Amino acid sequence: MVRFAAATGAALLLLVAGSSAIAAPDSRTAPMQFDVWTEGPAQTCGNACRTWVSAAGAITADTPRDFESFAKGRKLDGVTIALDSDGGSVLGALALGRAIRRLGMITTVGKTIPLTSVDGGQKRARLQPRAYCESMCAFVLLAGVERQVPSQARVMVHQIWLGDRRDDPTAASYSAEDLVVVQRDIGRLAQYTVEMGGGIDLLEIALKIPPWEPMRLLTREELQSMKVMTAADDVAEPSSGPATNSAALASGKRAPANGGGWILEASDNGPALSRSHPLTVE
């Protein structure tokens, strides 16, 4: 057995300014769920109400299968899928991304806020741009034929890691087989990134950030240069696709900050909020 501090699995740690921190809701840690929503209230947009697919929660090995079941019989070409996720399984994310690309969907980052009213069987919601796309979610974002990232959204990356060593990754022991898994998945990530038309710099930045350090927030300039974001619009505009409507879609000291996994951590620049995160198990 050997000890090492190298990249392996998939998950993230988030560092943000205290005043702008958004505590992650519990729904983001549950397995990813998909649903169809129509913009509302109806009286505010009328016939121009947009439709999108929400994708909220953690990416698991079963997520690609769940998405395929959801997509079956629906016309999703050109439809927007709004991501709100703290990442998860490497292989699950790659399979999900390829399924999204095959369907020709548009990706964005956004939190779906359901409304209480239901009009004609359509579930109404609004799409909030203040949302997170963390860890492997950033690679799913790459899958869109068009990719939109609102200025209020946060896309963050870090190294992949073996999920069963999540409790103390620096003290855990690793075998040669573990190293093989890590190298294999890094290679798959590189191939996928190029396949989706993204810049390999995305993977390079991610691999520089160990999972015990705060996640790396990608700047607007980086999102554009790495082609994580292809649309120039500053606000996510859900698209229901061409000739598609909702009916067709049918100092290192830490202190607890809140119940969402956030902690107050000392740093050279003063106190900052960071959030512990689940790690990927392959």
Positions of predicted regions on the chain:
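Positively charged n-region of N-terminal signal peptides that target proteins for export
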Residues: 1-4
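Bacterial N-terminal signal peptides
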Residues: 7-17
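Short helix/turn-capping signatures at newly exposed starts of structured segments
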Residues: 19-23, 92
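Cleft-lining beta-strand/loop regions that shape enzyme active-site pockets
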Residues: 32-153, 157-159
